[in-house]
Amino acid sequence: MTRSSKKEPFVEEKLMRRILEMNEKNEKRMIKTWSRASVIYPEMVGHTIAVHDGRKHVPVYITESMVGHRLGEFAPTRTFRSHKKDDRTARRR
């Protein structure tokens, strides 16, 4: 179900408050967040946000091309195990 056009995109208030405070002070430090659903705003460009992936925080540097996407899109939750077969089973066939 899509979000109503009357509503603004979701951003966790605490995260946005921290970003705005850092912009006022011209600070650049990493911010930890568990809010993967937060939408990236233009005010966040240039900051590094550590997004939680379920076991650790993944640092994500925000660029202009990321605006409008969600933070969780840039912190994958599943680790990929390769599909290669064991050498012994490959030799038998």
Swiss-Prot record:
Keywords, in A-Z order: Ribonucleoprotein, Ribosomal protein, RNA-binding, rRNA-binding
Pfam families recorded: Ribosomal_S19
Keyword Oxidoreductase (UniProt): no
GO CC annotation, single: cytoplasm
Keyword rRNA-binding in record: yes
GO biological process: ribosomal small subunit assembly; translation
GO MF annotation: an example: rRNA binding
PROSITE patterns: RIBOSOMAL_S19
InterPro entries named in the record: Ribosomal_uS19, Ribosomal_uS19_bac-type, Ribosomal_uS19_CS, Ribosomal_uS19_SF
Domain of life where this protein originates: Bacteria
Family named by the database record: Belongs to the universal ribosomal protein uS19 family.
Function: Protein S19 forms a complex with S13 that binds strongly to the 16S ribosomal RNA.
UniProt-recorded name of the protein: Small ribosomal subunit protein uS19
Gene from which the chain derives: rpsS
